[in-house]
């Protein structure tokens, strides 16, 4: 039943901020008012809210009000588990407590994830033993007693945990287990028997989570499940008319990942082994033969984007599609209830194979400019064995988002970094927000005084970076001098692990302060060590660009080794560049430069995490200052004071190090 809320958004926001010990922030108030207006008018809203704005309260307060008034849920989607946990474990409980006396009833909230994230009781009790899937394991592990016993121990622990856990949520298991172990006790949506057929349907952890979400006022989920809900034949999320997408800068990539598919020898072999006891041997032999021929072909073929499918590969894909489809039909005729779970799992894999092969074949029917999918072949080195993967992914997810997300719900998209080159247009285009769609962009700024707190230093005197990805001797000298001036306290963000490791080795020889490198330990442990010792530096690659939050004196220098353009041979992004060019646009600026600008904004955003932080972002790529696109890239970063004077920067870092030493 809908409720009447007598107090306004500004009034409730003020109560919440005061109760949580915060302070009034103009950007937060402006954002909350804009979110409330969007929910009222149905106009989509894109909000850039810098670190420190308090954006979660700015959208949660109007979301709760509308949920109570409309008696309908508001869905909040995030990219990362960390933000999900922050919302469900901290922000929402504190907010609900603070507003209890000001609202007609206590709001309810729930966390909902994809089915694979929850334990499957049917799989645990009816089909799981450590040896059940031995024939699906890599050959080298079948004879490794350590690997076998490790899997067995994990499965035993998971089975015991199933009888004590309330949620069955993988993220609640401490310590966690690897993907292979978790796959022994979980199922995908396709593998699920369904609540009506499953003997454990009434106890199902996933169904319980969906039930709780159906009763909630605010449902917290992730971009992957949001994408699954968009493409699924039946609804996964509760019916909703209002949606908030936090960490929206990741939305297009996460949706692309969900909409992608692949074919590998391992998947084909697993499918053949799963059906051995379920169907006529001739059906199995047909699938095995088609799989063997296809696997041999992709191992021998040249990796890279496939613009034209040759007749031979098309024949192999057709044979694979038909064999998988026939096997699926044979499984569906089975009626033995004792093998229902096994048949469901096998059927899911076969459907995936058949659908993916069909999709790849269909993608080559139209001419190149009109294609909606990109197909490419990768050869991955996995320890001692090579792995060939044929992948297909959408060229764009704009139409999917426009028709299946924005057409269904008024949407607020927010992040600290959404403008590229000073404009929302690039992001809006990637999402499918066009001039025909009612939307507006709003930048509420940041509580930080960037020009007084930070310096953007571009090392214009350095030679342009080489194609091999490794740093020049001049660049390594520059890194050593900057870290020495900063007294350690450096986060080094590199475009590749090769470059990060090379710089780490060089700095360990030259510097007296510790240098950690991604891969030395878990990322969380490395960040803890980095935070605990102000003299320590931490080098790494992409995950550190976006996932590190180190406020205070432990971080005063962010090093970026080169402009993070995508690889020229990246099949998906190069195809997108070509598609833009075919329409008369600038493919490099629209795709490659925008990709780099977003990563640069994310990386430089690691520097200032609270209003008292100070420091330098140093870009060791002279093209940032000399190339035509340099101004576009700089306009995408926070408004730091800018310089190319190395002497000034080193002096500033030394002053900052002395000041922090006195203060601490």
Swiss-Prot record:
Biological process terms in GO annotation: DNA recombination; DNA repair
Record's keyword terms, sorted: 4Fe-4S, ATP-binding, DNA damage, DNA recombination, DNA repair, DNA-binding, Helicase, Hydrolase, Iron, Iron-sulfur, Isomerase, Metal-binding, Nucleotide-binding
Regulation: Helicase activity on G4 DNA is inhibited by porphyrin derivatives meso-tetra (N-methyl-4-pyridyl) porphine tetra tosylate (T4) and N-methyl mesoporphyrin IX (NMM). Helicase activity on forked duplexes is not inhibited by T4 or NMM.
Catalytic activity annotation: Couples ATP hydrolysis with the unwinding of duplex DNA at the replication fork by translocating in the 5'-3' direction. This creates two antiparallel DNA single strands (ssDNA). The leading ssDNA polymer is the template for DNA polymerase III holoenzyme which synthesizes a continuous strand; ATP + H2O = ADP + phosphate + H(+)
Location of the motif DEAH box: 246-249
Top-level lineage group: Bacteria
EC code(s) of this entry: 5.6.2.3
Entry binding sites for ATP: 49-56
Presence of the UniProt keyword Transport in the record: no
Cofactor(s) it depends on: [4Fe-4S] cluster
InterPro entries named in the record: ATP-dep_Helicase_C (IPR006555), DEAD/DEAH_box_helicase_dom (IPR011545), DinG/Rad3-like (IPR045028), Helic_SF1/SF2_ATP-bd_DinG/Rad3 (IPR014013), Helicase_ATP-bd (IPR014001), P-loop_NTPase (IPR027417)
Residues reported in the UniProt entry to bind [4Fe-4S] cluster: 120, 192, 198, 204
MF term (GO), any: 4 iron, 4 sulfur cluster binding
Ranges where the Helicase ATP-binding domain occurs: 14-290
Effect recorded for residue 55 to R: Loss of helicase and ssDNA translocase activity, no change in DNA-binding
Family: Belongs to the helicase family. DinG subfamily.
Note in the entry: Dimethyl sulfate protection studies on 3 short, promoter-derived oligonucleotides (18 to 46 bases long) suggest they form G4 DNA structures in vitro.
Functional description taken from the UniProt entry: A structure-dependent 5'-3' DNA helicase that unwinds a number of substrates that resemble intermediates in DNA repair, recombination and replication. Requires 15-25 nucleotides of 3'-overhang single-stranded (ss)DNA for optimal activity. Unwinds 3'-flap and forked duplex DNA. Unwinds both lead and lagging strands in replication fork structures (may have branch migration activity). Has weak Holliday junction unwinding activity. In vitro at high concentrations also unwinds in a 3'-5' direction.
Protein name as catalogued: ATP-dependent helicase DinG
Organism of derivation: Mycobacterium tuberculosis (strain ATCC 25177 / H37Ra)
């Amino acid at each position: 039943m809908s409720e009447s809320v007598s107090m306004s958004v500004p009034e409730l926001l003020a109560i919440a901020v005061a109760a949580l010990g915060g302070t009034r922030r103009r950007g937060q108030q402006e954002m909350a008012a804009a979110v409330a207006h969007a929910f009222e008018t149905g106009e989509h809203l894109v909000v850039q809210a810098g670190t420190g704005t308090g954006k979660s309260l700015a959208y949660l307060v109007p979301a709760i009000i509308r949920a109570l008034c409309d008696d309908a849920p508001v869905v909040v989607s995030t990219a990362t588990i960390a933000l999900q946990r922050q919302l469900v474990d901290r922000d929402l409980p504190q907010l609900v407590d603070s507003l209890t006396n000001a609202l007609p009833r206590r709001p309810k909230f729930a966390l909902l994830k994809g089915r694979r994230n929850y334990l499957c009781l049917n799989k645990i009790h009816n089909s799981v033993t450590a040896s059940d899937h031995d024939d699906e394991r890599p050959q080298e592990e079948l004879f490794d007693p350590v690997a076998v016993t490790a899997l067995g121990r994990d499965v035993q622990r998971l089975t015991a945990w199933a009888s004590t856990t309330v949620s069955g949520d993988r993220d609640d298991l401490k310590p966690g287990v690897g993907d292979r172990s978790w796959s022994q006790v979980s199922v995908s949506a396709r593998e699920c028997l369904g609540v009506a057929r499953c003997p454990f349907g009434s106890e199902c952890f996933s169904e319980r989570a969906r039930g709780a979400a159906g009763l909630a006022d605010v449902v917290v989920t992730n971009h992957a499940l949001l994408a699954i809900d968009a493409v699924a034949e039946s609804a996964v999320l509760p019916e909703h008319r209002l949606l908030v997408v936090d960490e929206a800068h990741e939305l297009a990539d996460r949706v692309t990942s969900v909409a992608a598919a692949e074919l590998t020898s391992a998947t084909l072999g697993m499918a053949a082994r799963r059906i051995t006891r379920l169907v006529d041997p001739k059906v199995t032999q047909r699938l095995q033969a088609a799989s063997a021929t296809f696997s041999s072909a992709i191992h021998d073929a040249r990796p890279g984007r496939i613009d034209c499918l040759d007749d031979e590969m098309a024949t192999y894909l057709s044979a694979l599609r038909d064999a998988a489809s026939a096997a699926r039909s044979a499984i569906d005729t089975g009626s033995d209830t004792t093998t229902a779970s096994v048949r469901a799992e096998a059927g899911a894999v076969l459907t995936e194979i058949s659908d993916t092969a069909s999709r790849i074949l269909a993608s080559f029917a139209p001419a190149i400019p009109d294609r909606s999918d990109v197909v490419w072949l990768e050869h991955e080195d996995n320890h001692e064995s090579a792995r060939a993967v044929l992948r297909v992914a959408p060229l764009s997810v704009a139409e999917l988002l426009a028709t299946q997300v924005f057409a269904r719900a008024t949407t607020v998209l927010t992040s600290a970094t959404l403008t590229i080159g000073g404009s929302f247009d690039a992001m809006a285009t990637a999402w499918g927000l066009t001039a025909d769609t009612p939307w507006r962009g709003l930048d509420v700024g940041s509580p930080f005084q960037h020009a007084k707190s930070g310096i953007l230093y571009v090392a214009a005197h350095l030679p342009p970076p080489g194609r091999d990805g490794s740093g020049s001797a001049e660049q390594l000298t520059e890194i050593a001098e900057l870290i020495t001036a900063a007294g350690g306290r450096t986060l080094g963000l590199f475009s590749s692990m090769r470059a990060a490791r090379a710089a780490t080795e060089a700095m360990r020889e030259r510097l007296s302060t510790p240098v950690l490198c991604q891969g030395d330990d878990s990322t969380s442990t490395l960040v803890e060590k980095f935070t605990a010792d102000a003299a320590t530096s931490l080098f790494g690659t992409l995950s550190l660009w976006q996932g590190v939050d180190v406020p205070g004196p432990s971080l005063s220098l962010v090093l970026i080794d080169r402009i993070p353009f995508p690889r020229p041979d990246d099949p998906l992004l190069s195809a997108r560049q070509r598609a833009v060019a075919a329409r008369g646009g600038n493919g490099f600026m629209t795709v490659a430069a925008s990709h780099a600008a977003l990563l640069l904004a994310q990386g430089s955003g690691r520097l200032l995490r609270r209003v008292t932080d100070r420091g330098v972002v140093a870009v060791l790529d002279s093209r940032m200052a000399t190339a035509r696109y340099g101004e576009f890239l700089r306009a995408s970063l926070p408004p730091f004071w800018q310089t190319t004077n190395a002497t000034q920067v080193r002096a500033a870092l030394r002053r900052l190090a002395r000041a922090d030493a006195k203060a601490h």
